[in-house]
UniProtKB/Swiss-Prot annotation:
Organism: Encephalitozoon cuniculi (strain GB-M1)
Gene3D superfamilies: Homeodomain-like
Statement: the UniProt record of this protein carries the keyword Metal-binding: no
DNA-binding region positions on the chain: 119-181
Protein name: Homeobox protein HD-2
UniProt xrefs under InterPro entries: HD (IPR001356), Homeodomain-like_sf (IPR009057), KN_HD (IPR008422), TALE_homeobox (IPR050224)
First-listed, main subcellular location of the protein, grouped into a coarse class: nucleus
Assigned keywords, A-Z: DNA-binding, Homeobox, Nucleus
A Gene Ontology biological process term: regulation of DNA-templated transcription
Keyword Transmembrane helix: no
Length: 189
């Protein structure tokens, strides 16, 4: 039992050491390898109640470490992207010639610089399960693709979208998706 708790304690200590900033990712991996070899040598074959409890606790710790590392990687990607974007904005602003003028003349220049650095807005798609639910309703009601108010309320509740979003989705779907659905169904008949 003491060996089991020692291994679990080492895993938690390795996690804390890495995320507190005292250890590198490489040292975390080395420590996890040492823990794995110690685990295989002592506990791996233990399928008793205590062995199962330990395995579950170790799995919990390792999943938590994995999730934190994935989050850390995603954050680094976002930070790198933002740094590159800001560098681009700074280069864009500094590459323009300096204009000398009154305060009134400086304001349009500031607005122009802000406009050049403004991130383009990209439209976000609905989550896959939301689209899937709406598409399945459309497929079931292909002959009459106009949901009633009660059906719209049900779809709003299930998808979390507003009534206007549901209406717009069906307007677009009748133009873009429905012709292809009807074409596929007629091919199979």
């Amino acid at each position: 039992m003491n060996i089991i708790m020692g291994i679990l304690d080492q895993a938690v200590s390795a996690e804390e050491g890495y995320f507190a900033g005292g250890a590198s990712r490489k040292s975390l991996m080395e420590e996890m390898r040492r823990i794995r070899s110690k685990y295989k040598a002592t506990v791996f074959g233990d399928s008793g109640r205590e062995g199962m409890k330990f395995k579950m606790a170790l799995l919990f710790v390792l999943k938590r470490v994995k999730q934190k590392i994935i989050l850390e990687d995603r954050l680094m990607e976002v930070i790198d992207s933002e740094v590159a974007y800001i560098i681009g904005c700074v280069k864009s602003i500094t590459s323009e010639p300096i204009r000398v003028g009154t305060v009134e003349a400086v304001r349009p220049i500031q607005h122009e610089a802000e406009h050049k650095c403004a991130k383009p807005r990209t439209r976000a798609n609905f989550p896959m399960d939301t689209s899937q639910l709406l598409r399945s309703w459309l497929k079931e009601n292909m002959d009459n693709p106009y949901p009633s108010d009660a059906e719209k309320a049900y779809l709003c509740q299930k998808t979390g979208l507003g009534p206007a979003q549901i209406n717009n989705w069906f307007i677009n779907a009748r133009r873009r998706i429905l012709p292809f659905m009807k074409g596929k169904c007629s091919n199979f008949k």
